[in-house]
Amino acid sequence: VVVMEQGRIKQAGPAREVYAHPRDRYVAEFMGGQNVLSGRVAKVNGGSFLLKQGAREAIEVPLQARRGIGVGDTIDIAVRRDDVALVRPGASLPPGCGTALPSRVTAIEYQGYFVKVMLDTVPDDEFVAYVPEKTFFADPFNVGDVVLATWVADRARPLA
């Protein structure tokens, strides 16, 4: 797969690699299936950094192959929609999950093997969780419900 913008190659590689590891916001949004969050780096901790979005709780993001990130930098991160878990406030987070962004359910679409849950996590932008069908219907959410959007820390990827 080759993703181009205005006649220039942004990223090329096997489809699975480009989809799962987009290099930048353009590729992530073009390929779809990603939530992109923007913020400022609040702290760098060896193998990870903390991304701050306004008054929200900081998000821990592994540095992975990305180097040269410093405190105060503005950066985008991507989290695949199928890596986002939704839990009710007060419930325990799934193992390995640390970030928990309060959100309100704005729409629900049944897609067959998963349920697409749209959230107001990011003002004026789309944030979506693909919840497995059986998981969703075991304890379904309704439009207007408050939930916590969470994911395992190493599933967040810094973008260029």
Please annotate each region the language model reported.
Residues 1-57:
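Internal alpha/beta loop-helix hairpins
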Residues 34, 43-160:
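Non-catalytic connector elements of ABC transporters
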